Amino acid sequence: MLLPDWKIRKEILIKPFSEESLQPAGYDLRVGKEAYIQGKFIDVEKEGKVIIPPKEYALILTLERIKLPDDIMGDMKIRSSLAREGVLGSFAWVDPGWDGNLTLMLYNASEKEVILRYKERFVQIAFLRLEAPAKNPYRGNYQGSRRIVLSKRS
């Protein structure tokens, strides 16, 4: 079952929380302080924006730290305004027990560069309640992330 706005506010730890980002059945995550494009880390907070060149991908850190209880998971989708500009997103589930900022991958499939501003809303996360708490909630490689984390695949 999807959590409505009032349950998101009550049951999910989101820091920093923005009333503007709270939606009827989700929360709009914002562009955080760091990005990774073409092999380089970018200080988005200092630059004020991140530019994704045409036909390139970017890793974007969320401004928000999300902490999920053991019976709630997250599902993310790119905001439709960005999709209409040719931006695609590939996101994994946010597992029950997750705690940290999220590193999200965007791909600019368009012929024009895409500019994302620091603290701009770019991805919506919806929260789903499991029928019971997970027996083995997430405690993996990326738990506790506060910065962009590159793949830990060996």
Swiss-Prot record:
It catalyses: dCTP + H2O + H(+) = dUTP + NH4(+). This is dCTP deaminase. Pathway: Pyrimidine metabolism; dUMP biosynthesis; dUMP from dCTP (dUTP route): step 1/2. Belongs to the dCTP deaminase family. Pfam families: DCD. Keywords: Hydrolase, Nucleotide metabolism, Nucleotide-binding. GO terms for molecular function: dCTP deaminase activity; nucleotide binding. Homotrimer. Catalyzes the deamination of dCTP to dUTP. It comes from the Archaea. The keyword Hydrolase applies. HAMAP family: dCTP_deaminase. CDD domains: trimeric_dUTPase. Its EC number is 3.5.4.13.
